Amino acid sequence: CDVIIPLAALVGFPLCEKDKELATSINTTQIQNIVNVLSDDQKILYPNTNSGYGSRVDGMVTEEDELTPISHYGKTKCEAEDYIINESNGIVFRLATVFGGSSRMRTDLLANDFVYKLLTDRYITLFEHKFVRNFIHIQDVSRAFEFMIDNYYTFNNEVFNLGLSDENITKKQLVEKIQSHISDTSVNYSDYYVDPDKRDYIV
């Protein structure tokens, strides 16, 4: 094949914490194996996560900032990124939280999860609502990959954050945006529970 986009992965904080060995095998080792057998004329575009930025309180992060992943998921993906950059001429995208329609909808993604709960339960309990996340629609992700395939040798061996600048929003703001499209819903803001996923950053 001409272009490799390795999408197979164990994704997200809960799933990777549940089976760290499997997460490492799929998210890191399989990427290393792919890179090791690449031919010189094959292109690789790697979808990393911006979870590698961890929790930041000192302004906006850029591609030049050090990665400090705080979850096993983030660590496995960042280790794979390092290998691609050091051992190949690939291109890496650090993706914001992706949302959008799918034939196999992932409700563990924050935006999709909130939409699903507000549609089905008509209410949601929200904790640590001030945490900031960044989002991007799946169609924008697809367009970015298409662009880089066509311009591969201009940008190869580089890393790019991929998200929407105006979608650096708090969890509370996200819920309010969704509520503007779904009527007769309510939100319970709770200080009792904590979010085990401590990501909090602006990209």
What are these regions (language model features)?
Residues 121-122, 126-203:
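C-terminal substrate-binding subdomain of Rossmann-fold SDR/epimerase-dehydratase oxidoreductases
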Residues 22-24, 59, 65, 70-78, ...:
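Short-chain dehydrogenase/reductase
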Residues 82-133, 138-147, 178:
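NAD(P)-dependent short-chain dehydrogenase/reductase
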Residues 6, 43-48, 52, 91-97, ...:
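Structural signature of the Rossmann-like NAD(P)-dependent dehydrogenase/reductase core
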Residues 1-25:
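NAD(P)H-binding glycine-rich loop region in Rossmannoid oxidoreductase-like domains
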Residues 6, 32-70:
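Conserved Rossmann-fold NAD(P)-dependent oxidoreductase catalytic core, especially the SDR/UDP-sugar
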